[in-house]
């Protein structure tokens, strides 16, 4: 059994992360899950949420926007629409997006076609604010 997981996280625009890590946690469609070296192979979908990984005792966080997570032979492949590292998130911009989404949802009926769009925007903004708060910035 390997002592590390080889992780590759990719968006349609760039390779965001290539690391060997001790463990990784993500938010799947059915809830949060964790993977350690030696994990059984599996493939799952990801929802808007947080991905965190531990490397040499240091935990790093990313905000993700929908995608897929695959584990096979101690290699983790993460394919997502977008991914932002905690220290790269513009906290003020994320808070502003959160406020805009909240205001839009207050004005819409849940049956309105754009309600789900703003609901997803709210979820993305909320995750970005939460993850940015874990970056260690002051």
From Swiss-Prot:
GO cellular component: plasma membrane; proton-transporting ATP synthase complex
UniProt record similarity statement: Belongs to the ATPase epsilon chain family.
PANTHER family (alphabetical): ATP SYNTHASE DELTA/EPSILON CHAIN, ATP SYNTHASE EPSILON CHAIN, CHLOROPLASTIC
Keywords noted in UniProt: ATP synthesis, Cell inner membrane, Cell membrane, CF(1), Hydrogen ion transport, Ion transport, Membrane, Transport
Bilayer topology annotation: Peripheral membrane protein
InterPro entries: ATP_synth_F1_dsu/esu, ATP_synth_F1_dsu/esu_N, ATP_synth_F1_esu_C, ATPsynth_dsu/esu_N
Entry function: Produces ATP from ADP in the presence of a proton gradient across the membrane.
Biological source species: Geotalea daltonii (strain DSM 22248 / JCM 15807 / FRC-32) (Geobacter daltonii)
Name of this chain's protein: ATP synthase epsilon chain
Subcellular location per the Swiss-Prot or TrEMBL entry: Cell inner membrane
GO-annotated molecular function: ATP binding; proton-transporting ATP synthase activity, rotational mechanism
Keyword Transport appears in the UniProt entry: yes
Subunit structure: F-type ATPases have 2 components, CF(1) - the catalytic core - and CF(0) - the membrane proton channel. CF(1) has five subunits: alpha(3), beta(3), gamma(1), delta(1), epsilon(1). CF(0) has three main subunits: a, b and c.
């Amino acid at each position: 059994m390997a002592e590390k997981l080889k992780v590759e996280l990719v968006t349609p625009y760039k390779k965001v992360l290539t690391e060997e890590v001790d463990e990784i946690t993500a938010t799947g469609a059915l809830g949060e899950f964790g993977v350690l070296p030696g994990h059984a192979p599996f493939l799952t979908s990801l929802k808007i949420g947080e991905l965190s990984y531990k490397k040499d005792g240091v935990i790093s966080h990313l905000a993700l926007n929908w995608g897929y997570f695959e584990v096979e032979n101690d290699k983790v492949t993460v394919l997502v629409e977008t991914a932002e590292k905690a220290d790269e998130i513009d906290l003020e911009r994320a808070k502003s997006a959160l406020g805009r989404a909240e205001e839009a949802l207050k004005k819409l009926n849940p049956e309105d076609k754009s309600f789900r769009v703003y609901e997803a925007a709210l979820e993305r903004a909320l995750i970005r604010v939460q993850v940015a708060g874990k970056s260690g910035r002051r």
